[in-house]
């Protein structure tokens, strides 16, 4: 009995997929990457923004075709789209045999067995349920880096975001559970742990009564075979001295912070339900750079939020120009059902949203090139990810680069390197988002 998984959306969703794979492996199921060979196809979906929702729907419909044209006997849909739109999916896509909500993925084995027996099965548990599996997950990232999801849900309730509705309130995983998971990953050869959650910076508040991210990082850093620890999804207003100190002083922690700010206009930040002002954002950025001069800061922005004026947009451009983020991504605003922002007045035309996004990215391209050129002549550590076929060039990442969202370091050498090796590289050339270097002797 062969199962194929399609995992869509964010890295948090990927962790859920890997957990489901681990559960099924321990129940004796086999896996395939070929949808034509699969007896069961499972799609773990996303619906964070319109494009993600559409990708999920298109993928479900594509996989549904294999119930007619392939070996597929059952189609299972899990994740955010299944949780939010389970009634609509059951009505509109009858080929779907089972639905699993975001807090129900640990029941995947029972679901598979049920649908193979010809029984329909939908399990949409309360989004606030915290799933902790005993089964070791299956690594799908290549084996040298992995995501460690330290919490579920979110309590911030930004006006544009549906995450609290589909992922529930903020729930931290117990520290001992996370340390055990990290130890298991290290035993499998993982070198880089990437801490993720809807928000990492308030880890522990709900179960320990105070923020405990810094303490968690210290415990993870004590694991022998973990070489790098990277922290994503930090809310700027929650970055405290304890976190800054552990990033500064713990050698295994990458001098890198992903800190989504979404906008730089005070009026738009307020409409978004964000809890910072432009000046407060400047203050935390300056504080991070004063304490950790070589820190790489990544952020994300949203253009075209309802009511965004040309003046608001220019404030964003000025902020990007002044703050010089090392890494930056931009999304156009996507109105989501059942969110306050979707019914706000002064919705922005798609063309204007895209023009403003392009303007920010054009500016950031210049900033990124300047930042890259500053690296020329420096020697840095790189984690090797692979080799370009028929070329003496390896592909790696520096501490400044998170996988899948940032750039690469192309390393020229005739040495025999392995994926997962961490090597010293001298930077010889720079592009907007990537670096070129040579292996140090």
Can you name each region flagged by the protein language model?
Residues 161, 165-168, 228-237, 263-274, ...:
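Conserved strand-turn element in the central/C-terminal portion of the radical SAM core barrel
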Residues 343-441:
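Terminal RNA-binding accessory module
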Residues 1-203, 242, 253, 257, ...:
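Proteins enriched for Cys/Gly/acidic motifs involved in redox and nucleic-acid/cofactor modification
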Residues 178, 195, 231, 259, ...:
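Conserved, mostly hydrophobic/aromatic
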Residues 208-221, 241-255, 308-325, 350-355, ...:
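Short, electropositive alpha-helical surface patch
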Residues 197, 233, 261-263, 299-303, ...:
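Active-site proximal loops enriched in glycine and acidic residues that flank catalytic Cys/His/Asp
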